């Protein structure tokens, strides 16, 4: 089992659904997983820690059919401050739309970042109805998908 750095890119990080999705992942992951919330001032700090991990898990909501500005700004700093050993990148993205396909353009943006910066893109979990699903009986399906 590798070490995973979970990076919460939600603008509402401390009280976000993205935080809860990251916590669900951590509860099932058998290796070491550490979580960091992106803020306006900690981009370089997070970038300096990334080389200690085998995997990055970006967790964030869809914003206006794209990445939240918090994630965009972080990726710019990461591009300028790459780690020596580049971990694999995975994504958990959620949107308020029922259809998870609404996330596809955003996922392609992360894949493009990975391709341009020689990170291996590993896996993605695209969640529709992300704002509401955690408060419903359907939460079990999300937990099952994250676990597997």
Which residues are covered by each model-predicted region?
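Glycine-rich phosphate/pyrophosphate-binding loop and the adjoining helix
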Residues: 1, 127-148
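N-terminal beta1-alpha1-beta2 submodule of the flavodoxin-like/Rossmannoid cofactor-binding fold
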Residues: 1-85, 115-116
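Structural beta-sheet core signal
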Residues: 6, 58, 89-93, 123
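Short, histidine-centered active-site or binding-site loop motifs used for metal coordination
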Residues: 8-10, 93-96, 128
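Generic structural signal for well-ordered, non-membrane alpha-helical segments
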Residues: 14, 18, 22, 103, ...
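Well-ordered, non-membrane alpha-helical segments in soluble/globular domains
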Residues: 71, 104-108, 145-148
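Ser/Thr/Gly-rich flexible loops in soluble cytosolic domains mediating phosphotransfer, phosphorylation
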Residues: 84-105
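A hydrophobic alpha-helix/topogenic segment detector
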Residues: 98-137
């Amino acid at each position: 089992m590798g070490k995973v750095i979970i990076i919460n890119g939600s603008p509402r990080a401390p009280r976000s659904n993205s935080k809860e999705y990251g916590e669900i992942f951590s509860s099932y992951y058998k290796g070491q997983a550490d979580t960091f919330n992106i803020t306006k001032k900690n981009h370089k700090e997070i970038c300096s820690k990334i080389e200690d991990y085998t995997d990055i898990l970006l967790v964030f909501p869809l914003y206006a059919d794209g990445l939240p500005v918090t994630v965009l700004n972080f990726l710019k700093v990461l591009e300028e401050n790459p780690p020596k050993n580049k971990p694999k990148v995975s994504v958990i993205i959620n949107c308020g739309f029922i259809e998870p396909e609404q996330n596809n353009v955003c996922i392609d943006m992360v894949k493009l970042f990975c391709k341009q910066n020689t990170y291996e893109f590993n896996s993605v979990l695209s969640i529709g109805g992300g704002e509401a699903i955690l408060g419903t009986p359907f939460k079990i399906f999300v937990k099952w998908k994250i676990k597997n």
